Amino acid sequence: PSDITLSLAKGARMAGALIYEDTKVTGIEVDKGVIKGIETSQGYISCGVVIACCGQWTRDFARCVGVNVPLVSVEHQYMVTEPIAGVSPDMPTLRDPDRLTYYNEEVGGLVMGGYEPNPIMWAKNGIPKGFHYQLLESNFDHFEPIMEQALGRVPALQTAGVKMLTNGPESFTPDGNFILGEAPELKNFMSAPALTPME
């Protein structure tokens, strides 16, 4: 994901975009339904379009201008295994939509995760102030059904050592589809917050 992000940023800069990192947007100036600019921790920036692509923070951010972005943060877990014979760095990512699982190579082992049919909601009243990509406590009981599905696809997981089980919040839409485009409530307010693949 970081390589994709850096590539998109490079392309945006080549097209004239300015990217401000570590800069908090504190407000959006709207005059008669037209976006005029944004207030930031670094000062005012004049603009006619706002693109809200801030993941699980998008819902709260959009509310400041009356835009509803239907997102929910849920706990998302994946495990990382010890090296497995036959797994190589050029192994393609494997997704099994029937089992709702995914697999990709990680230092000779596998990252394996899945999308639970009964996810655990997190921060339903808003992301806690000061939360910045921290991890949540692992929940082995909740991960067990995903593991059972994975064993049916990748039997080598039965004997693979597990380095870690990681749990972190991710944002999803109620129907699992993407939200991408202009908000109906405000012209030129675009959103692209939940692009997590579930299918």
Where does each model-flagged region fall?
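Short, hydrophobic/aromatic-rich segments at coil-to-beta transitions
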Residues: 34-38, 89-92, 188
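Helical element adjacent to the flavin cofactor pocket in flavoenzyme catalytic cores
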Residues: 1-49, 57
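Short Gly/Pro-enriched turn/cap motifs at secondary-structure boundaries
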Residues: 69-73, 91-95, 101, 161, ...
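C-terminal catalytic lobe of FAD-dependent flavoproteins
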Residues: 7, 98, 137-199
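Central helical "cap/lid" subdomain
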Residues: 44-90
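Conserved FAD/dinucleotide-binding core of flavoprotein oxidoreductases
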Residues: 105-152
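Conserved FAD-binding catalytic core of PHBH/FMO-like flavoproteins
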Residues: 84-115
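A structural signal for short hydrophobic beta-strand segments in well-ordered beta-sheet cores
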Residues: 25-28, 94, 102-103, 180
